[in-house]
């Protein structure tokens, strides 16, 4: 019985680690202000949970965060639930969802992203803006 309980615990821990996200949640204004405009650049997705386009983007954005996970000290991949934080959405002057912006280090001025919603295109944009290469293999 003890072995069965231990095995269940191990499986639960493995599942939790496997589901860990590298996308930093900055929905709280204090968290956003502590990251954006500081020493690392930040790619931020402003989303709403009910938004269909946001839901379709989520897996691509997760892969983007995975591709830059080892470079978190230089570039952060983050998200903000702008529906939950209308004050921050108003401050950024959002007009639709999802809104994707890259904030250079030490800057509150975001560069909007309007390209394809693929991991590859997003990674290329982040690399272009930050000069930081992702861990994604180059296109064939």
How does the language model describe each region?
Residues 1-78, 83-95, 99-140:
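Proteins that catalyze or organize thiol-disulfide redox chemistry
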